[in-house]
Amino acid sequence: MQSGQEVVYLHLDDIIPNRFQPREVFDERALKELAASIKEHGVIQPIIVRQVNNKYEIIAGERRYKASALAGMTKIPAIINNLDDKPLK
């Protein structure tokens, strides 16, 4: 993490998946394993998001986001980054 990047805790309901996500399939067993780890240890590495209107779109960390929801979490650590669409395509 670069200096000056603050970690905030966002409600999962305020986060949307990235419409440019190249991964179309998430391995269900691996997600369940990650969810179990998150239940035990929490999310160790924050996801990276950008603000889009009144929501936050995932730039990196969709597996952590999905596993956190599966684990029953309501918030996730995140770093808010101001990117436009170009680097996401």
Language-model-detected regions and their locations in the chain:
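Short, charged/polar connector segments at secondary-structure boundaries
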Residues: 1-81, 88-89
